[in-house]
Amino acid sequence: MGSLSIWHWLVVIVVVLLLFGRGKISDLMGDVAQGIKSFKKGLQDDDKTAEKTEPVKSIDHAAPPASAPRSDVGSKAV
């Protein structure tokens, strides 16, 4: 009861062909193929864009920035 035999699948295929017809199914498959092609093209375009970007410059955190020493002794709160 849980598994479908070959006869069940044949009946399903015949019903689908009768409902949709040969032309609609081929049009649907063509639309699916175009969608897949445009998706792959978009992925390739993204890869090309990523390759063209310049690498990010790294910042050396080992050396502290050169700045004047801070003195809070002479400051007054207003």
UniProtKB/Swiss-Prot annotation:
Highest taxon above the source species: Bacteria
Region (Disordered): 43-78
Record family assignment: Belongs to the TatA/E family.
Pfam families, alphabetized: TatA_B_E
Compartments (UniProt record): Cell inner membrane
GO BP of this protein: protein transport by the Tat complex
Keywords from the UniProt entry: Cell inner membrane, Cell membrane, Membrane, Protein transport, Translocation, Transmembrane, Transmembrane helix, Transport
Protein name as annotated: Sec-independent protein translocase protein TatA
Signal peptide region: none
Quaternary state and interactors: The Tat system comprises two distinct complexes: a TatABC complex, containing multiple copies of TatA, TatB and TatC subunits, and a separate TatA complex, containing only TatA subunits. Substrates initially bind to the TatABC complex, which probably triggers association of the separate TatA complex to form the active translocon.
Chief localisation class: membrane
Biased composition (Basic and acidic residues): 43-60
Keyword presence, Protein biosynthesis: no
Membrane topology: Single-pass membrane protein
Chain segments annotated as coiled-coil in the UniProt record: none
Cited PANTHER family: SEC-INDEPENDENT PROTEIN TRANSLOCASE PROTEIN TATA
GO CC annotations on file: TAT protein transport complex
